Amino acid sequence: MTVLIVEDDDITREAMGQYLKLSGFNVIEAENGEKAVELSENVDVALVDVMLPGMSGIEVVNKIKAKNPSCVVFVVTAYDDTEIVKKCVEAGADDFIKKPVNLELLRLKITHALRNRVFHMYRNSYLKSLKKKLFLLEKTAEEFFTEYEDFLFEVLEILNMLSEYRDMETHRHTERVGWLSGRIAEEMGMSEVFVTEIQFAAPLHDIGKIGIPDRILLKPGILTPEEFEIMKQHTTIGFRILSRSNSPILQLGAEIALTHHERWDGSGYPRGLKEREIPISGLIVAVADSFDAMVSRRPYKNPKPLEEAFREIESLSGKLYSPEVVEAFLKLEKEITDVYRREKDEDTSHNGGRSHQSSPGEGVEGIR
């Protein structure tokens, strides 16, 4: 370790230098500030006398610290003036030593200061290395979650496709229910996270229908009471399928699958929940699912006109549906109408100009 002694008094400088050399330090000496600054670039410790010819000790401290920030600087002074000591500390001095210098105390102070310097060097190096590792970990974690998110969306799409293979209309229905649920949740002031999650989870509401026999699922007519009891099981089947996952979206999907046929007045299934017993996700999807089912063609029914479906949902507010959800839904009436008409126009052009006609007497009671 190299110590720079900056002292204009030859006797004091040589005494300190000799003692420190015997203590195992490499010593460099300077009798003025200009030479001290010139020699300070690679030293570990600098002992600077306050009273120097030409450049003041305070100025020397400042310049040494600017040139070699890691250097430990001691101010050597015969004065008790605290103002001078304060100015030296403000200039960058780490400690001060009073004259006449106690050489053993000087050695101990230097040794202690160097130990602290080494500790801080290793600590800073470690922190820098740790910061780099944390950056890499964050980057790796970000990549992992991006891959996980992509994987999850693929799973959601596969689950939707499973429904599509059983009922070709189901896939488009689930997409519309997802969009409607997201818009209703947004209109209700739900969090951005919830809006995103319900938009992806709502399309899974009927996933349990993959466990319903085709003779019931695709029956072109009203179900018998026995058949309807079997159809009701799609809610619990869907819940069992989705609830096995720890994914927040699939957990929400399980909740929706189980509760989207519950009704505000307690007349729904499978558990006959009512009002606030029904989770908000189930209340939202109940409206989205019912509306889309009303205006869509099914093997057992023709579609209702949009205006008629809106008014039917409105008339059932506080009966079958949550008043709060219906209120948000009706605020979106123009936007929803535009989207559905645009989709209908696209379907009509693809089907050679054919469009669907509604039949009288097809109400919400026909929704499965």
From Swiss-Prot:
Chain intervals for the UniProt region annotation (Disordered): 341-368
Q: Which residues does the UniProt record annotate as the domain HD-GYP? A: 148-345
Q: Which PROSITE patterns match?
A: HD_GYP, RESPONSE_REGULATORY
Q: Which GO terms describe its molecular function?
A: hydrolase activity; metal ion binding
Spans through the membrane: none
GO aspect biological process, one term? phosphorelay signal transduction system
Q: Would I find Phosphoprotein among this entry's keywords?
A: yes
Write the record's keywords in alphabetical order, separated by commas.
c-di-GMP, Hydrolase, Metal-binding, Phosphoprotein
Q: What is its EC number?
A: 3.1.4.-
- 4-aspartylphosphate modification sites are D49
Record-listed a divalent metal cation 1 binding positions = D206, H234, H260, H261
Q: Where is the composition biased (Polar residues)?
A: 350-360
* Amino-acid positions noted as binding a divalent metal cation 3 in the UniProt annotation, renumbered to this chain: E169, H173, D289
Domain Response regulatory as annotated: residue spans = 2-114
Which reaction(s) does the protein catalyse, per the Swiss-Prot or TrEMBL entry? 3',3'-c-di-GMP + 2 H2O = 2 GMP + 2 H(+)
This chain's function reads: Phosphodiesterase (PDE) that catalyzes the hydrolysis of cyclic diguanylate (c-di-GMP) to GMP. Hydrolyzes c-di-GMP to GMP in a two-step reaction, via the linear intermediate 5'-phosphoguanylyl(3'->5')guanosine (pGpG).
Query: What is the protein name for this chain?
Result: Cyclic di-GMP phosphodiesterase TM_0186
Instruction: State the species of origin.
Output: Thermotoga maritima (strain ATCC 43589 / DSM 3109 / JCM 10099 / NBRC 100826 / MSB8)
